[in-house]
């Protein structure tokens, strides 16, 4: 039985359920050295309930996890693998492990997540133990690098600290340019303000480090990108390098409407936990964005593909006069696909932009998301092209039209397969031929102000 009521009331239906694989991702920064029991979590979505089977080095570990629970390490509800790093180190010594996760929805195709590398380091034997101090104002590049005799540059400090060491920064400004160290580093090297140093007295300036696995903690990053200029604060090496940013801040000193500035560029594999991006044209494009705030950006506040965005917030997205602005963009042209995106637990407010522009996406979930508009006149969101295995669950977007693309020649038309919108609150939803699941699009248990067929 089915009932459709328009103009602001409930749409309820008994409809087909997903026939597609679960949508899931690790909520873990890889290559960590861990001890004790490390809670490695998976975030997963499907129209049906899911469960997760975990492996360590290819062997099944523990019981199948039937439901998510709060991971105290991340603050996120996850399917958790309690990785016994300490116990394994006691038995086998410190070493590398490969974690696996198989996400299963009853009667559907399971999904094997990409393998995750971690290091059991219960005995503390892995990686460099060296701590190097740097002082850009009073240091000496040929000094010993200890507290009383710091080096001058970040490049020298990173080299001396070694693979997995620690760099302490005293007050001053430090460049990311040409830090060196190559692409074969195995462990995260920590870079952080020295004990007792106010983070606001340490300034990290834009550059291309040219090395791998730098872990920045409690630092402020800046670029100086003026009108007509293009730049990134932290540049990658075409996908060969990764960086982890814990409680770090990113900004363009000239403001969001100046140059075309990005927090990350050239395919840096970025992992962002905590911190804030503000007064810069673009938000951070990261593989993992957890607990991060994005404020006062011009456009593209969040990643559009190949990312887990969880428990983040966005406030004040507005382009310069005459320019366009979109919160989330995920677009591909055949034969390529965009997507592989999870956005969960997002609160976005102060939006004067299109909320999303999606074309030819698959394997995406938008769950427990609220969008609050500051201004929306003449603006709309759209979904176009082939759209496969996409779930909108408990999404609130009132006051902006969502266009499911339709054209006279059929090019770029919305062609859904296993697309579900449930428990959502929308404004105008236009362009849908059928919403009962019979044509690949299932809208249920939702409130829609106006629906145009």
Give a label for each model feature.
Residues 116-156, 173, 194:
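Right-handed parallel beta-helix/beta-solenoid
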Residues 184-238, 244-255, 316-319, 344, ...:
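Right-handed parallel beta-helix/beta-spiral solenoid domain characteristic of secreted/periplasmic
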Residues 223, 252, 257, 270, ...:
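Residues in short coils/turns that link rungs of repeat/solenoid architectures in beta-rich domains
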Residues 86-96:
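Surface-exposed, short loops/turns at beta-strand junctions within beta-sandwich domains
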Residues 190-191, 215-218, 243-245, 263, ...:
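All-beta strand scaffolds that present successive hydrophobic residues in beta-strands
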Residues 154-161, 174-184, 201-210, 233-235, ...:
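Short, T/G/N/S-enriched strand-turn elements that build extracellular solenoid repeat scaffolds
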Residues 19-40:
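Short, compositionally biased P/S/T/A/G/V-rich stretches that sit at domain boundaries
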Residues 70-87:
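Aromatic sugar-binding surface patches on proteins
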């Amino acid at each position: 039985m089915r009932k459709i009521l328009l103009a602001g009331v409930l749409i309820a239906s008994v409809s087909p359920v997903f026939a597609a694989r679960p949508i899931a991702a690790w909520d873990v920064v890889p290559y960590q050295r861990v001890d004790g029991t490390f809670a490695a979590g998976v975030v997963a979505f499907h129209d049906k309930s899911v469960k997760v089977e975990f492996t360590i080095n290819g062997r099944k570990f523990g019981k199948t996890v039937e439901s998510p629970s709060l991971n105290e390490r991340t603050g996120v509800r996850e399917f958790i693998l309690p990785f016994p790093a300490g116990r394994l180190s006691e038995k086998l010594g410190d070493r590398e492990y490969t974690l696996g996760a198989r996400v299963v929805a009853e009667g559907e195709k399971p999904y094997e997540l990409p393998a995750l590398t971690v290091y059991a380091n219960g005995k503390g034997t892995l990686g460099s133990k060296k701590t190097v101090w740097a002082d850009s104002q009073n240091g000496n590049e040929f000094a010993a690098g200890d507290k009383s005799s710091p080096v001058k540059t970040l490049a020298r400090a990173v080299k001396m600290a070694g693979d997995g060491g620690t760099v302490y920064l005293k007050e001053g400004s430090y460049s990311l340019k040409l830090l060196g160290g190559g692409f074969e580093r195995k462990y995260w090297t920590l870079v952080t303000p020295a004990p007792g140093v106010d983070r606001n007295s340490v300034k990290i300036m834009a550059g291309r480090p040219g090395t791998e696995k730098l872990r920045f903690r409690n630092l402020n990053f800046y670029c100086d990108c003026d009108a007509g200029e293009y730049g990134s604060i932290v540049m990658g090496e075409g996908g060969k390098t990764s960086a982890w940013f814990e409680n770090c801040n990113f900004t363009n000193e000239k403001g969001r409407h100046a140059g075309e500035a990005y927090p990350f560029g050239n395919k840096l594999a970025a992992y962002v936990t905590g911190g804030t991006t503000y007064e810069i044209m673009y938000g951070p494009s990261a593989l993992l964005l957890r607990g991060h705030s994005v404020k006062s950006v011009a456009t593209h506040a969040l990643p559009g593909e190949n990312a887990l965005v969880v428990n983040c917030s966005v406030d004040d997205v507005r382009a310069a006069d005459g320019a366009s602005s979109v919160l989330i963009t995920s677009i591909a042209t055949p034969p390529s696909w965009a997507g592989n995106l999870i956005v969960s637990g997002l609160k976005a407010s102060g939006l004067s932009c299109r909320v999303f522009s999606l074309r030819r996406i698959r394997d995406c979930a938008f769950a427990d998301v609220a969008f609050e508009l500051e201004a929306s006149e003449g603006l709309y969101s759209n979904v176009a092209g082939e759209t496969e295995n996409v779930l909108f669950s408990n999404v609130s977007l009132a006051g902006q039209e969502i266009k499911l693309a339709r054209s006279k020649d059929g090019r770029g038309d919305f062609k859904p397969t296993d697309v579900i919108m449930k428990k959502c609150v929308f404004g105008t939803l236009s362009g849908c031929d059928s919403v009962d699941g019979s044509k690949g699009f299932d809208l249920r248990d939702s409130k829609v102000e106006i629906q145009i067929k």
